[in-house]
Amino acid sequence: MFQGSMPALVTPMTNGAVDFEVLKRLVDWHVEEGSNGLVPVGTTGESPTLTHEEHEQVIETVVKAAGGRVPVIAGAGSNNTAEAMRHVQHAKDVGADATLVVTPYYNKPTQRGLIAHYEALAEVGIPIFIYNIPGRSVVDMTPETMGELAKHPMIIGVKDATADMARVSRQRETCGTDFVQMSAEDASALGFNAHGGVGCISVTANVAPKLCAEFQAAMGAGDYTEALAYQDRLMPLHNAIFTEPGLCGVKYAMSVLGLCSDEVRLPLVGVDESTKAAIEAALRHAGLLS
């Protein structure tokens, strides 16, 4: 159920407000283009600058628009366990298929604290993906800690943003081969799957969903020669999008293709002219812009 290419959805904005009509259109487009799932209100969905009400409205809108055609993994993390509990419960109540819960950031819990946090959330009764992103949260969940959490039937996988290929094999050892490992890094997704991953929660898939889905399908079929051809086609776009914060880059790329505006909320700002030029060149290289 959880595999392949899953866009880490942007949250479209118009004049400072979430544009729910555009969001619904994006959901339909992603399904039509072959995306294997949708992940709203993560980092790329501007979760830090959404109100609690907006957060819940975006999750509910995506679940309803998807209509069961693809699974929805709802962003539900917080560095406050009680707040995360509210998000996880809401995701369950509106019919999300799973939740994505980031390791608590800023307050730097110990590994024991991480275990207590996730075990408390797992009692809500909806599948949980751990989001391990030490570059943003500072704390790195160890494979051993993840293995302890994987014993809980509701903790089913990880979105891994470490870009450490050896980590995938180590987590297969500690968590078991059925534990669902999804890459959080577009540029290293090929290597991630080769080591035992089953997909990518992708930023680039916001603008190139068909290519990203075909890339993942090639790896799923064991055709890494074909997958490498897709990698070569997409790599300049991965790099250009992440020249500045990825959600800013991918929103600009989407605006070039007429999918949504490039508007982001402060403290983020739109990309500069040199980044715009690099993104446009990369879109041409990928065959997405003439």
UniProtKB/Swiss-Prot annotation:
> What is the E.C. number?
4.3.3.7
- Signal peptide start-end: none
Annotated catalysed reactions: L-aspartate 4-semialdehyde + pyruvate = (2S,4S)-4-hydroxy-2,3,4,5-tetrahydrodipicolinate + H2O + H(+)
- Site (Part of a proton relay during catalysis) at T43, Y106
What role does it play?
Catalyzes the condensation of (S)-aspartate-beta-semialdehyde [(S)-ASA] and pyruvate to 4-hydroxy-tetrahydrodipicolinate (HTPA).
What is the designated name of this protein?
Answer: 4-hydroxy-tetrahydrodipicolinate synthase
- InterPro entries on file: Aldolase_TIM (IPR013785), DapA (IPR005263), DapA-like (IPR002220), Schiff_base-form_aldolases_AS (IPR020625), Schiff_base-form_aldolases_CS (IPR020624)
* Species of provenance: Jannaschia sp. (strain CCS1)
